[in-house]
Amino acid sequence: MSAMKALLEEIAKALVDSPDDVQVTEVEGEQTTVLELRVRTEDLGKVIGRQGRTARAIRTLLSAAGMKVHKRFVLEILE
């Protein structure tokens, strides 16, 4: 498991009511890695946040951490 995947999983589990249902899938490309986050429908609002602020903050963390390894990380939140 990559460090970014583990980071996203820990953040998401801390936010939701059903941490056992959090799934993170990693799709790696040459320069970009897509992290797909799946949570229960009831927890979707907690991960996205009001006006997308929580999702934006998570994306910012992934972007900052990705600079260290010279890779771009994209977060997709799925049901």
Give the predicted meaning of each segment.
Residues 1-46, 56-79:
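RNA-contacting regions in translation and RNA-metabolism proteins
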